[in-house]
Structure formats: C-alpha cells, structure tokens
Amino acid sequence: MSCVNIRGCCIGEGRPKVIIPIVEPTETAVLEKAAEFSTLRADCVEWRIDCFEGAKDLPTIVHCAAKLRVALKDKLLLFTFRTKAEGGKAALAHEEYLHFIRTVLATDCADLIDIEFFTVGAELPALIEDAHTAGAAVVCSSHDFHKTPPRAELVSRMVAMQQAGANLPKLAVMPQSRADVLELLAATAEMADRHPETPIITMSMGALGAVSRLSGEALGSAMTFANPGQASAPGQVSLDIVNEVLDALHL
C-alpha cells in the first residue's frame, strides 16, 4: 500500500493513524476541545462543521479555522461537512456544498478535506484537483447507514474514487449481520492487495462492526476514528481502547 505523507505523518504505513472528531456547536467550545485534543495520543483531528451552529456561516468558519489550526499544533486537521443525506447534521444544496469545499480550501488550513463521492458527482475530479492545488489531501467518502453493499460494489466504488484522484477513499457501511462485517473486511483486504495505489479508510458501523475499526493494520484500512469522549458515528470505540488494541495488534 502506498503512503500519503502529511506533516511527516505517513498514512498507509504501519499502525493505522487515529482520527478524533470535534463536534462542538460554538467557536469557544471548538477551540477548547482543540487545545485538549492537541495533547492526546491521536494523529488527526476532524472538525465536523455540520455540527457547528454556524455551519452555513462561511466567514465564521474561515475565522474559526485559522484559530483551530494554531490550537492543534502539529496534529493533522481534517475538515468535514457531513451532509444529512450521508448521516450528518445539516443539509447543503449541491452548489452550496461545492462553494463550502472551495471556501475551506482557500483558508490554507486544511491538511485533509472530506469530499462526499455521491454528493459531488461528475464534478469530483475537478474538485479534487482544486484541493491538491491548495495543498490538501482528499478523503473521498461514501456512507450507508442502512446496509452493507456487496463486496464487488464496495471495491468498485473505492476504485472509482482512486481514479478520480482521491488520496484516501473512505467507506462506512452498516452491517445487518456478521456476514456483512466480513464482506466489508474482505473488500478492504482486496483493495489493499489489488489496488494499492492509495491508502484506504473503511469501517463497518455500530457495535457489530467495531472490530473493523481495530483491525486496519492487518486487513488494510489506514486510518480509524476514535471517540475521545463524544462519538461522531455509531460504533466508535474510546480513544484509550483504540490505542491499546492498535498497539497490541501492531505487526
């Protein structure tokens, strides 16, 4: 698997890199969490802007982003607006979403930016190129909170993300059975073995899928989300346990 190197952090090499989310509603609370998270054992902080009271107030987001970048010190910063259609807290029209992405990129604060695969559609390659021009790596994401598609579909979706130029294809799906968890893990291993051009991020959500958040080094998922006190998705494991298990399973 190839490596994405950001600020000296090699995503796709060795132990999966740990992401912790900020889901606070106000600028003051966001910055307080950032100061706290800057000292924790995690590689990357995700700002879930859809959870922010000013989620559609772009000048406020730009102002807060600059302060957040400073507060996090050397942590990687991932910007995410998770739309309601993909399980988030707020909705954006198509053009609003594109404008949001480009506004965040213009801040020069993003180490990584989440771009939703289905939300952007045909404009994905151009938007990814914009991100790369701005110096940001792209997490291209797809979420299914109802089911786990077949393995072949999961793989083809991640390959399409790669072909569009994404640095880190990401899939999060909901299992309805143990077989669904295995389907996601098999798709992850197949991608890592047969399409190693980029690292990938995968997870099976909920308690049933929690094992997928901890087995990335062995099976091919390069990053995992951990809960530092408040989860941003079903099945996130606490940060302390994630670190303990990743250490125990380190190859």
Language-model-detected regions and their locations in the chain:
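Active-site beta->alpha loop and helix N-cap motifs at the rims of alpha/beta catalytic domains
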Residues: 2-3, 13-133, 143-147
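Glycine-/acidic-rich phosphate or pyrophosphate-binding loops and their flanking alpha/beta elements
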Residues: 6-7
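Catalytic alpha/beta core domains of metabolic enzymes, predominantly
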Residues: 112, 117-251
